[in-house]
Amino acid sequence: MNVLSGAMRYATPWRTYRRLLSYAREYRWLLVVAACGALLEAVAGSTFLALMKPITNETFIERNREVALWLPLGIVGLFLLRGIAGYITDMAMGRAARSIARDFRVCVLTKYFRLPGSRFDGEPVASMLVRLGSDSEQVAHAVIDAMKVMVQQTLQVIGALVVMLWYSWTVTLAILLVAPLLAWVMQRVAKRYRRISHHIQESNAQLMQAADQALSNYQDVKVYAAQESELERYARLANINLGLAVKVESTRSISSAAVQLLGAVGLAMLLLIAGHEALAGRLSPGDFVSLMTSMIAVIPALKQLTNVQNMLQSGIASAQRLFSVLDSPDELDTGRRPLGRARGLIEFRGITARYPGRSAPVLDSVSFVAAPGTVTAIVGRSGSGKSSLIKLIPRFYEPESGQILLDGHPLQDYLLADLRRQIALVGQQVMLFDGSIADNIAYGEMRQVVSEEIERVVVDANAQDFVNQLPEGLQFQVGVKGGRLSGGQRQRLAIARAMLKDAPILILDEATAALDNESERLVQDALQRLMPERTTLVIAHRLSTIKHADQVLVMDQGRIIESGTHVDLLARDGLYAYLYSMQFRERPT
């Protein structure tokens, strides 16, 4: 079977970030508003720094009473303007960030629905949930939140440098000699953050997967007293995650300390050169205070720009994980032949299929015909290829060689959506969704059916007795995965769903294997109403349920080794007769 390679190809960080920014295009007006707000913030901050000269010279040296009166009012006005501008920036950026996170979640889930079934075998659900959850949130941080910090603090630095250049360009240029060293520090920090961020996201997925397995199977964990081993496994993964988080904190702390040290070097140079300029009469006390205040304002801004690398690189790592999904090829859907309602003639011609990494095929030269209105039972030992064969009909997988025909045409000739409309599936593990009974029966494209149709199939599926006993009837909430219903009740709702779909092809995948006798009788009775006038394929675990099948296919190691009716196969005394006798032989008492 064709399966996507597990290898992930990452683009360069800059190309990834540029691609991320394309998702912000739809919200460019919000970003323009935010940029205007950030610019106003920077102007207000720079104006305050520039005012340090008149505050010092006019108030403390010249003792100008008029300036001493209007300066406090001007400062209050500046900070009021800065607060309003900051609010506008935060609101616009926040709305854009959350919108982008939502867009990524919807896009990625939409893409997962278009991927081939092999992807779901190769990637744990926990990893998918991490992509939809924290990865999407990290991307929003990288696109918007990191951008906000970079824009705000960069404008703050530029504004402070303009003030410094205005009052003494010689002092400012001398201080800027430390800029190349600062750029080198930030580059090294970015590379380290990016490397660690990839590992952290993978570690988060492993943590979620371990917790999901332990909690989903809590009954087995308790019965087999496996709490300690599960906790040890989870703690080991949590310790790995902790180690990575500590590396992030270590990198952040060291980079912040390095920036502060470079800032201190800049301040020392400022004091040295400014003192020389003051002695030469080229620098007033007000000039010096403005320079010093501007330099002090630059240091925390540079520190934030260094720290934003963590947010930015984590977002880029998450974006690369998301883009690895979005760039994966969709399941093949190249058919153009329209299909209203099929007759249901299914023909397998020399089908061979193989799982990746396995030399032996899971299906080997399988050929048979299932005529409309007939029941084809598929039996065999575990691992003989029964479920793999069934999954080829809705094209969840593609065969390696051979052809599968529906009504005389290859499955690939039909549109996937049209093909799957012809199929109803009832499996052993029935998946119900959190919602009402009515919602679970009238599922997907059947949502618009009238309530009378739902009530009819509930009766036909032998589900009316337990539905009528529920406090809200068809509006009863079944809970997550149908957890408020028994296995037999869930199975009958799945049959009701298949009845409502009224598809010409019915696939039953061991639909009664895990039921008690009473539930099995009710389900079998409902299936007898469902199967007539359809092409039915049954994977049977209990061989007593297929005695009346039109043909029985016996599989072993991916091949059909026997075929015929129940009576014919018993008479041949082959594998089918052996399996049947193993189920029904009398044991000595």
Curated annotation (Swiss-Prot):
It is found in: Cell inner membrane. Its EC number is 7.5.2.6. GO terms for molecular function: ABC-type oligopeptide transporter activity; ATP binding; ATP hydrolysis activity; ATPase-coupled lipid transmembrane transporter activity. The chain crosses the membrane at residues 29-49, 68-88, 157-177, 254-274, 283-303. SMART domains: AAA. It is a multi-pass membrane protein. Residues 346-582 form the ABC transporter domain. Disulfide bonds: none annotated. It comes from the Bacteria. Coiled coil: none annotated. Residues 32-314 form the ABC transmembrane type-1 domain. InterPro entries: AAA+_ATPase, ABC1_TM_dom, ABC1_TM_sf, ABC_transporter-like_ATP-bd, ABC_transporter-like_CS, ABC_transpr_lipidA, P-loop_NTPase, Type_1_exporter. In MsbA the ATP-binding domain (NBD) and the transmembrane domain (TMD) are fused. Homodimer. This is ATP-dependent lipid A-core flippase. The gene is msbA.
